[in-house]
Structure formats: structure tokens, C-alpha cells
């Protein structure tokens, strides 16, 4: 193992979101260990500027070009460079860094992640859309340039840790856990009337609104099933999800000898982030320690396809492969926009996704794999247009 630089150069894409803020929390606790190169965000200029000042970042970038004057004003006198727009995000990804957090939500995180891999860096991947929409391309890009991708989702970090030193050929099954979300105790017949406020309250995790609603609908878990297939190269038949209300076991890996290895930890994203930040070493993290005697009980049950139709759609997407993951993600994002805007009900989101997949399958074969990032972005836009049209009906 080659020695690390005296200070690790780090960049955080999506710095103002939940993952970004937890990453900043860990970095700020050890300023002697890190040099912050770039922080990026969207509309929360005050937070972006405050963090850039506090961490003495080289550059702060907002994705919103019209907010550049605000960012410049907020950074005046700090010595931190300000920039805005898609080109600026890519330029920030080109800046030399040893470790980059990819936490921009949605398809917007694709291009910066791909650009960073060209420089052979370590990419901590919290942007699950990258693997769902362009998994084979992303992994090929990393291999071509000698880059490392580390998963930051708590479930995939747990699987990754359970597989250290193991032969992937000996893996019989991978089980990722789901809390069930904020509506898990609602009668199934009542789910159709759930509001964004109802679905946006999570019993265990402190996350942003969109991902919390995706947790309630299990679209988040559906994405993670697809992500598991892409990242670990395991066949869909060997990947499953189980509802685990306590959110203390994040994933389990079953082996051909019958052993089942579980990863336990508190529902705190700083654990998965900290593991990726310090990999291959482990560092002390400011997270709660589990008291097994106090926990006393761990529960599991199988999720229902009628309650969580997103899981059924995800299994079909895993079997189909090709561009279906990209379509699934794009339609899911449009459907969530529609739910947040009050245009459709909570249980209508899965219908938008299914309709979009069906509509695009009539245009071409969903199993045709995209060959370039441009192919992915084109498919993404087509799917968004179709899903938006369905939403407008």
C-alpha cells in the first residue's frame, strides 16, 4: 500500500445536502488531515459559502449560474474562488484531488463523477443514480484510469465491508435492509391519501425530503437493488430486500457454506462516509456505539409488492438491464416531482414509472446498453419527456 500524502486533498460534490454536510462534519473534526479543494452545491448559497470559508476551500461552485453574484458576494474577502454552472462543475472535477465525494442528487451528478474518474482518483459514490443509469460505463471508466469507486450508501458500504477478503464467487445471496419508511405502519389501503408531509418524516434516518419520500415508497430501496447488481456483479436472483424496522443491520451477505455475515451499526451516515473517507484504514468516528443488550430485539419481514410496487419494477429492470435503469431513474424523479406538486397521489408514482418503461420499450429495445455518457443523457431526457407527458394527463 502506497503511503498517503501528508494531507489528503478532498472535494465534495453536493456539499450542502445531507451526505455533503455529514462529510464536512467529519473533515472539520480533523483539519490537520485534509486539504479541501472544491465544494459544490445548488441553491443554498449561504451554507455553501460558510462551509467554503470554514474549510478554506480553493473553490466553491454553485450549479445555478444566476446565483454566481450571490456566491461571490458571500465569499468576498475569503480567498475562495467562486464559479457557477455545468462547465464550472466539470472544471472543479478536473482539479487534482485524492478523494472526491459524489453526492449530487439525481442525474446531474453523472458528468462530474465521470470526469473525476479520468484522473484516477478515489470516488466515494453516494450518487446512486450513476450506477443505476450508467453502471457498466462508470465501472469501465474507473478501470481504464485506475480509479477506485467506494460505495457510500449504508447498505452497499455494509456489503463492501462484508466482502473484504472474500471471493465474490462464494457469495450465494446479498440481502439489503429497508426501514419501511415513514408510512410503514399505515394500513395499505390508506397509502393512496398520504401527503408529502406524511411520507417525508423518517422514523430512523435524518435525510433530505426527496430521499425520505423515496424511502417511504421504497423507490430508494428499488434503486439500491439495481445498484447492488451493477456494483458487485451479482445476478438479480441472488439479491433481495427485507424490511428491518430498527435500521441497525444494514446488509447481510450469505455464502455458499451457509454462513450469513451481517453488518451492524447505528443509523448514522457518518459511518459509511467515514469508512470511505479513511479506506483502507479505519479511524475513530463520532457515532453511537450499539448496546446489544439494550436493543434486545431485531425484527425482519418480507416487503409486499402491492404495498411497495417499486420493488417489483426494480426486479424487472435488473433482469432487462441495458437502458432500463436510466429510464427507471428518470421517470422516478419526474413522478416524485409530480407527487410533491400535488399532481398525483403517493401510490400513483409507480404507475408513471411503469408507463414510461412501457412507452420506451415500444420505441426500442430496453436491453440495448448505452455506449457513451451522451447516450445515457439522451435516454434520460427522453424518459423525462415521456414521464412528464404522462404526468400532465
Swiss-Prot record:
Its EC number is 1.1.1.267. Pathway: Isoprenoid biosynthesis; isopentenyl diphosphate biosynthesis via DXP pathway; isopentenyl diphosphate from 1-deoxy-D-xylulose 5-phosphate: step 1/6. InterPro entries: DXP_reductoisomerase, DXP_reductoisomerase_C, DXP_reductoisomerase_N, DXPR_C, DXPR_C_sf, NAD(P)-bd_dom_sf. Transmembrane segments: none annotated. Mn(2+) binds at residues 153, 155, 224. Pfam families: DXP_redisom_C, DXP_reductoisom, DXPR_C. It is an enzyme of class 1 (oxidoreductase). It catalyses: 2-C-methyl-D-erythritol 4-phosphate + NADP(+) = 1-deoxy-D-xylulose 5-phosphate + NADPH + H(+). 1-deoxy-D-xylulose 5-phosphate binds at residues 128, 154-155, 179, 202, 215, 220-221, 224. NADPH binds at residues 16-19, 42-44, 127, 129, 208. Keywords: Isoprene biosynthesis, Manganese, Metal-binding, NADP, Oxidoreductase. GO terms for molecular function: 1-deoxy-D-xylulose-5-phosphate reductoisomerase activity; manganese ion binding; NADPH binding. Its cofactor is Mg(2+); Mn(2+). GO terms for biological process: isopentenyl diphosphate biosynthetic process, methylerythritol 4-phosphate pathway involved in terpenoid biosynthetic process. Belongs to the DXR family. Catalyzes the NADPH-dependent rearrangement and reduction of 1-deoxy-D-xylulose-5-phosphate (DXP) to 2-C-methyl-D-erythritol 4-phosphate (MEP). This is 1-deoxy-D-xylulose 5-phosphate reductoisomerase. It comes from Jannaschia sp. (strain CCS1).
Amino acid at each position: 500500500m502506497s503511503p498517503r500524502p501528508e494531507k489528503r486533498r478532498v472535494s465534495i460534490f453536493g456539499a450542502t445536502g445531507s451526505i455533503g454536510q455529514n462529510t464536512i462534519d467529519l473533515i472539520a473534526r480533523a483539519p490537520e488531515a485534509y486539504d479541501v479543494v472544491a465544494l459544490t452545491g445548488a441553491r443554498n448559497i449561504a451554507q455553501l459559502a460558510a462551509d467554503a470559508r470554514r474549510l478554506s476551500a480553493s473553490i466553491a461552485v454553485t450549479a445555478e449560474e444566476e446565483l454566481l453574484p450571490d456566491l461571490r458576494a458571500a465569499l468576498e474577502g475569503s480567498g475562495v474562488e467562486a464559479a457557477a454552472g455545468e462547465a464550472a462543475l466539470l472544471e472543479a472535477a478536473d482539479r487534482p484531488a485524492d478523494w472526491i465525494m459524489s453526492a449530487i442528487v439525481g442525474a446531474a451528478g453523472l458528468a462530474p463523477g465521470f470526469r473525476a474518474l479520468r484522473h484516477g482518483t478515489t470516488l466515494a459514490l453516494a450518487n446512486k443514480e450513476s450506477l443505476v443509469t450508467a453502471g457498466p460505463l462508470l465501472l469501465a471508466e474507473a478501470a481504464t484510469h485506475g480509479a477506485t469507486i467506494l460505495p457510500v450508501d449504508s447498505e452497499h458500504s455494509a456489503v463492501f465491508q462484508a466482502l473484504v477478503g472474500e471471493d465474490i464467487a462464494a457469495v450465494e445471496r446479498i440481502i439489503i435492509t429497508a426501514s419501511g419508511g415513514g408510512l410503514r405502519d399505515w394500513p395499505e389501503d390508506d397509502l393512496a391519501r398520504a401527503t408529502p408531509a406524511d411520507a417525508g418524516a423518517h422514523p430512523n434516518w435524518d435525510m433530505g425530503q426527496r430521499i425520505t419520500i423515496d424511502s417511504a415508497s421504497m423507490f430508494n430501496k428499488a434503486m439500491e437493488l439495481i445498484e447492488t447488481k451493477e456494483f458487485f456483479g451479482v445476478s438479480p436472483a441472488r439479491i433481495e430486500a427485507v424490511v428491518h424496522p430498527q435500521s441497525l443491520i444494514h446488509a447481510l451477505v450469505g455464502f455458499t457454506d451457509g454462513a450469513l455475515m451481517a453488518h451492524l451499526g447505528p443509523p448514522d451516515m457518518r459511518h459509511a462516509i467515514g469508512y470511505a473517507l479513511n479506506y483502507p484504514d479505519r479511524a475513530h468516528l463520532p457515532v453511537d456505539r450499539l448496546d446489544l443488550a439494550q436493543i434486545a430485539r431485531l425484527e425482519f419481514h418480507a416487503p409486499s409488492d402491492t404495498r411497495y410496487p417499486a420493488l417489483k419494477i426494480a426486479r424487472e429492470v435488473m433482469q432487462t438491464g441495458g437502458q432500463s435503469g436510466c429510464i427507471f431513474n428518470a421517470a422516478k424523479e419526474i413522478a416524485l416531482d409530480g407527487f410533491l406538486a400535488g399532481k398525483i397521489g403517493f401510490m400513483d408514482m409507480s404507475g408513471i414509472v411503469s408507463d414510461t418503461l412501457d412507452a420506451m420499450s415500444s420505441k426500442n429495445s430496453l436491453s440495448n446498453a448505452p455506449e457513451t455518457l451522451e447516450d445515457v443523457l439522451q435516454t434520460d431526457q427522453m424518459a423525462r419527456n415521456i414521464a412528464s407527458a404522462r404526468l400532465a394527463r
